[in-house]
Amino acid sequence: TRLTCNGVGIDIVYKRLLVNEYLPIMEEQPDLLNAYRAGAICMVNSFRGKLVHKKAIFAVLTNERYRYLFNDAELEAIAKHIPWTRVFRDEQTENKGEAIDLVEWTRANSHKLVLKPNDDYGGNGIFIGWNSTPAEWDAAIAAALADGDYLVQERVKTAKELFPMLTDKEGHWEMVEQLVDLDPLLFLGEV
């Protein structure tokens, strides 16, 4: 199944289309998926990359019940680099070795938590506990539970660096402190 556009064959596709954007049109527009399944194209940012796009991977990495999956070096790296995260639902879990009721603990610890959708980007749907009133945080908790696909995550210090920024149309610029947000890409196992 060769993928073409206006009669020109396509061998490589850099996919920017999100899976949740493709699902509603997949039946009417199957050519991309068919070519991918047939191995007729090389797809950069393939559908298999969706796993790391899902933020719930952090809940697996930081949950005590999955510690047995990792060796000591991996556990050390996880503890150092991955914020404590849980799929947000009405359940018992642990935080720093202490048994907690996740919903009530989340309600009581808004000062250090965020609620975020598992499958979104660009800050969409995020509730920031430390910027919320108690009533807003209660509403966020209710919305996240009703949605069913939210995470609760502990606040981490966000890195800041100086970056050049244009200040006018004449090309003047200045160094401005900005948050650092890296989106590393992997290709054949290399960053």
Language model features with spans:
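Domain-scale recognition of functional cores that engage charged ligands
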Residues: 1-191
